[in-house]
């Protein structure tokens, strides 16, 4: 009980709730701006600092064929490759939603800095740009998919 009351005291004293609302809106605005050029991004949404980036099937025929190959292996394959690249290349831990494999969750702590949020925006922009423009993203991921099928 004391720990809970102490936590509530810190949340109130440091105004972490209102701060999360303000930073979250800024964060999603920056995400929308950074990801707007990419057709595979359907929507950026959220509340407070909890945000989601929803992806969609690519319109480009070459990318769509690769995406469909992923989807046949497992519906979560595309999202998991995004998660893998964010962690491996950017040292950022994120995950896909359990009820919609096309949504990447961003759930930074309430004490996150604006600079850290900007780092996330740049990191996800780089990974999405790679997925949208580079065959390397897809060929490496298809290799992963083949290994997953053989397990």
Regions found by a protein language model. Give the residues of each.
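Conserved N-terminal phosphate-binding loop of PLP-dependent enzymes in the Aspartate aminotransferase
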Residues: 1-151
């Amino acid at each position: 009980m004391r720990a809970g009351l102490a936590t509530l005291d810190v949340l109130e004293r440091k105004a972490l709730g209102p701060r999360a609302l303000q930073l979250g809106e800024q964060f999603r605005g920056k995400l929308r701006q950074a990801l707007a050029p990419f057709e595979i991004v359907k929507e950026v949404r959220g509340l407070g600092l909890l945000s989601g980036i929803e992806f969609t099937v690519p319109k480009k025929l070459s990318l769509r064929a690769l995406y469909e190959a992923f989807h046949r292996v497992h519906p979560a394959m595309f999202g998991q490759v995004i998660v893998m690249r964010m962690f491996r290349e950017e040292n950022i831990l994120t995950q896909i939603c359990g009820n919609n494999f096309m949504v990447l969750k961003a759930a930074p702590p309430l004490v996150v800095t604006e600079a850290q949020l900007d780092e996330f925006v740049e990191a996800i922009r780089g990974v999405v740009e790679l997925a949208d423009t580079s065959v390397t993203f897809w060929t490496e991921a298809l290799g992963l998919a083949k290994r997953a099928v053989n397990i």
